[in-house]
Swiss-Prot record:
It is an enzyme of class 2 (transferase). One of its GO terms (biological process) is cell wall organization. The lineage of its organism: Bacteria, Bacillati, Bacillota, Clostridia, Eubacteriales. This is Phospho-N-acetylmuramoyl-pentapeptide-transferase. It comes from the Bacteria. Its cofactor is Mg(2+). It catalyses: UDP-N-acetyl-alpha-D-muramoyl-L-alanyl-gamma-D-glutamyl-meso-2,6-diaminopimeloyl-D-alanyl-D-alanine + di-trans,octa-cis-undecaprenyl phosphate = di-trans,octa-cis-undecaprenyl diphospho-N-acetyl-alpha-D-muramoyl-L-alanyl-D-glutamyl-meso-2,6-diaminopimeloyl-D-alanyl-D-alanine + UMP. It comes from Clostridium beijerinckii (strain ATCC 51743 / NCIMB 8052) (Clostridium acetobutylicum). The chain crosses the membrane at residues 13-33, 57-77, 85-105, 121-141, 155-175, 181-201, 208-228, 232-252, 257-277, 305-325. HAMAP family: MraY. GO terms for cellular component: plasma membrane. Pfam families: Glycos_transf_4, MraY_sig1. It is a multi-pass membrane protein. Belongs to the glycosyltransferase 4 family. MraY subfamily.
């Protein structure tokens, strides 16, 4: 019996991981030349790091690669329309759709102004409310508190819905801000997903774990093309999709607050922008040479590879802390 269970778990881990990885590896060489031909290139902000100007024109919307890779892997595994994996896929698609619209408008206008803030927020709130309602009616309104006995959970009641709406806005924007240098958001997110996959298997949330591991595999495959020097960027299509699906994975595991710990890099990136903007408005001075903070480290001479390596290592440490916090 024990061997049978181990075999089942191993197949649930290896099959989606390998499929996600291989599908991304196959799709990359197909999508990159197509996006080049369509001139779906990234417009680089003039106020950004000067070293990034040479990246102008690099194909964007690479999130399509790991979305298709993950979706294909999950569908091959054979899922029912309202299974947790399909709900995760729906949330992946919903937030990715917002990013897709944003990317398309940037390409059309040939600048970094895509959807207006109000337009993006309306769509974010719309999809967040739908997922909050799903959580409220199907998952429960109680959430785990880090470093507190798992038997104790904070029950938010009806306040759960507005909490989740704000939570989605925070997570999606945080991941979006992290996607500023080659391979950073991809690498950090692979580690975060691995954490949630392990938790999913440990808590018998196998559907959630399978999705997380399939997406982690797809991102590892995508990293072949997204690592420095990047041949393609994930774009808002990818970063908003990742933020949304990480939010939903944590929601299903009742670990919304754990995103603050294991996704500490996302939090630091966001706080650096808030601190920079607030300081400049109040004092006329900047705390960092540039924000988000990964650009600050670029300005002081760190290479993109060094930043990704250190930030990924920090994420791995934060995930260990996340396990301790259970």
């Amino acid at each position: 019996m024990g061997e049978a269970i181990n075999l089942l778990i191993n197949s649930k881990i290896l099959a989606p991981l390998i499929m996600g990885f291989l599908f991304s590896i196959v799709l990359g060489p197909i999508f990159i030349p197509i996006l080049h031909k369509l001139k779906f290139g990234q417009n680089i902000r003039k106020e950004g790091p000067k070293s990034h100007q040479k990246k102008s024109g690099t194909p964007t919307m690479g999130g399509l690669i790991f979305f298709i890779a993950t979706a294909t892997a999950i569908l091959i595994m054979g899922q029912k329309p309202m299974s947790r994996e399909m709900i995760l896929l729906y949330s992946f698609l919903a937030f990715g759709f917002i990013g897709f619209l944003d990317d398309i408008l940037k390409i059309i206008h040939k600048d970094n102004l895509g959807l207006r803030a109000a337009q993006k927020m309306i769509l974010l709130v719309l999809f967040s409310v739908a997922l909050a309602w799903y959580g409220y009616t199907n998952v429960g309104t109680d959430i785990l508190i880090p470093f507190i006995n798992q038997n104790f959970r904070l029950n938010l009641g009806i306040l759960y819905i507005p909490f989740i709406v704000v939570y989605y806005a925070a997570v999606t924007n945080a991941v979006n801000l992290t996607d500023g240098i080659d391979g950073l958001a991809t690498s950090v997110t692979v580690i975060v997903l691995t954490f949630f996959a392990i938790i999913g298997f440990r808590t018998q949330n196998v559907e959630v774990a399978v999705f997380a591991i399939a997406l982690a595999g797809a991102l590892l495959g995508f990293l072949k093309f997204n690592a420095f020097p990047a041949k393609i960027f994930m774009g808002d299509t990818g970063s908003l999709a990742l933020g949304g699906v990480i939010g939903t994975i944590a929601l299903m595991l009742k670990m919304e607050l754990f995103v603050i710990i294991v996704g500490g890099i996302y939090l630091i990136e966001t706080l650096s922008v808030i601190i920079q903007v607030t300081s400049f408005k109040l004092t006329g001075k900047r705390v960092f040479r540039m924000s988000p903070i990964h650009h600050h480290f670029e300005q002081v001479g760190w290479s993109e590879v060094k930043i990704v390596t250190i930030f990924s290592s920090i994420t791995a440490i934060l995930c260990i802390i996340g396990f301790v916090a259970l």
